[in-house]
Amino acid sequence: MRVQSFGRQATLIAGLTVSVFGCSPGEPETAYASSSTTSSTDAQSSQSVSPVKGEALRLVLASSGNVARYRVREQLVGHDLPNDAVGETKSLTGALSIDSSGKVIRDVSKFTVDAATFVSDRDRRDGFVRGRLLEADTYPAITLVPTSIRGVNLPLPKSGSAAIEMTANLTVRDVTRPTTWKGTVQFANGSVTGSASTAFTFDDLLLEQPRVPVLLSVADTIKLEIDFNLVSQP
């Protein structure tokens, strides 16, 4: 695995999301060249694992309430104002393990997104994102491995909310870079729901920035957001 370290880390608004090129309903279709996108795998529910030494809390993604989303600012030919291209998927799995001191247990903490399942409001855009951009047939999984988290304290609160900040290694097409996520969470009887987001450039992950005739411009920044529903695992 190639690991890329970058000096700049952009942090975002709250909202686990990957954003790329879209236009809102009623806008002319963005003319991205379509690629082979027939292969996709359904997300499988997180499997139980044996207790880890030192583990005090294990949170797993529930079977519903989870969305990963990408967002990229673009401006189309013939339009005075730019708009966001947005695609999302509900095909994500994973878990977060924390020890008694509040540190992430990295070996058993990981989230996985099915790269072939992002859907926007335009089929041709989806083909471009899955095919030429993410190469989902070759690299079917986007992974996020948490390395630290702040805002989740033990014992887990039974109610209330908190701001969180998480650092994690994001891997797309076998290129890994550190990211910082900021968001908010709500606690309720052993569950943790909320959203978080980060941002990075195309170059950060060695991705090709789209250049097609119908686009006047595409922002260099990709926003990735995740809405999550985590439940504690005994």
Where are the predicted features?
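Sec-dependent bacterial lipoprotein signal peptides
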Residues: 1-21
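Low-complexity, acidic/polar, glycine-enriched regions of mature
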Residues: 23-234
